[in-house]
């Protein structure tokens, strides 16, 4: 199961997930000016971020929207970034947040678990219902793939639906979590966690989610730039594992803390990952 690989990476390298939500504005001007086109510049930037953080981070999350917005050339860049990480032996999460009926979901599964856009994990939105997961299950069982389902997200608007009260004094996200936990038991790895994980933002208190979802591995966004605190992020883990804590802008733009020109941006990114790990261990 792919979840066993991710669990082992967390054990060996720590729980940090590096987000490659790479916007052109994030590139140091001196670095950008070395290239004749934006796509080559961003790919080179991504390469150097990956190379500098590879031995100190568990995995990488690539937000597809940043690449889709650049059109066909952006999707070629997306493909090259995914391939670069996977050929190095890294684990990549494609942050695509798809969610649709089974016929369409089958095509999404094929698109993102095979071919040009193949990744190890993808993010999905389960709020159309759990039947939308059916086309992905063969990939979990037989092709070393996994998903993270949106459960309780880090944005302020998550309260509009996810936090609604139900008759049994639970909230919508609690019920969705129960379904994720139950479905996930069919795809448990040797590590005790399922290849069906959940997205839980650390901009809100943990509130027993970790205890209730014992077999669900967490993708934890919201740390740093979105306001999530280290002590809250760490509370979603179990003995330092059971989840990955994502940081994107905090790592990609770490150079701005020390060197506005960004001559050593990859070294700054590496140091940010290391400091993040130290902070999480201390608390």
Curated annotation (Swiss-Prot):
Catalyzed reactions per annotation: orotidine 5'-phosphate + H(+) = UMP + CO2
UniProtKB keywords: Decarboxylase, Lyase, Pyrimidine biosynthesis
Group of enzyme by EC: lyase
GO biological process per UniProt: 'de novo' pyrimidine nucleobase biosynthetic process; 'de novo' UMP biosynthetic process
Keyword Lyase among UniProt keywords: yes
Active site, UniProt feature: 97 (proton donor)
Annotated metabolic or biological route of this protein: Pyrimidine metabolism; UMP biosynthesis via de novo pathway; UMP from orotate: step 2/2
GO molecular function list: orotidine-5'-phosphate decarboxylase activity
Domain of life: Bacteria
Assigned EC number: 4.1.1.23
UniProt cross-references to Pfam families, sorted A to Z: OMPdecase
Keyword Lyase attributed: yes
Positions in coiled-coil regions: none
Family: Belongs to the OMP decarboxylase family. Type 2 subfamily.
Listed name of the protein: Orotidine 5'-phosphate decarboxylase
Organism: Clostridium botulinum (strain Loch Maree / Type A3)
Gene expressing this chain: pyrF
């Amino acid at each position: 199961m792919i979840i066993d690989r991710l669990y082992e990476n967390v054990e060996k390298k720590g729980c940090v997930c590096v987000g490659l939500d790479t916007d052109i504005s994030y590139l140091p001007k001196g670095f950008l000016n070395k290239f004749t086109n934006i796509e080559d510049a961003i790919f080179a930037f991504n390469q150097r971020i990956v190379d500098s953080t590879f031995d100190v981070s568990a995995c990488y999350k690539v937000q597809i929207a940043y690449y889709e917005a650049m059109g066909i050339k952006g999707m070629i860049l997306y493909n090259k970034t995914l391939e670069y990480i996977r050929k190095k032996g890294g684990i990549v999460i494609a942050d695509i947040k798809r969610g649709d009926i089974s016929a369409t979901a089958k095509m999404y599964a094929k698109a993102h678990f095979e071919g040009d856009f193949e990744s190890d994990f993808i993010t999905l939105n389960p709020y159309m219902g759990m039947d939308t997961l059916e086309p992905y299950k063969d990939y979990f069982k037989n092709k070393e793939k996994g998903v993270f389902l949106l459960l309780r997200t880090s944005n302020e608007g998550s309260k509009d639906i996810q936090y609604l009260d139900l008759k049994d004094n639970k909230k919508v996200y609690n019920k969705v979590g129960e379904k994720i936990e139950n479905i996930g038991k069919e795809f448990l790895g040797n590590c005790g966690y399922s290849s069906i994980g959940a997205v839980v933002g650390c901009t809100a208190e943990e509130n027993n989610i970790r205890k209730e979802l014992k077999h669900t591995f967490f993708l934890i966004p919201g740390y740093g730039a979105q306001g999530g605190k280290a002590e809250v992020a760490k509370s979603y883990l179990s003995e330092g594992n059971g989840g990955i804590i994502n940081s994107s802008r905090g790592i990609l733009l770490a150079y701005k803390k020390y060197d506005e020109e960004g001559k050593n941006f990859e070294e700054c990114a590496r140091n940010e990952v290391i400091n993040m790990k130290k902070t999480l261990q201390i608390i």
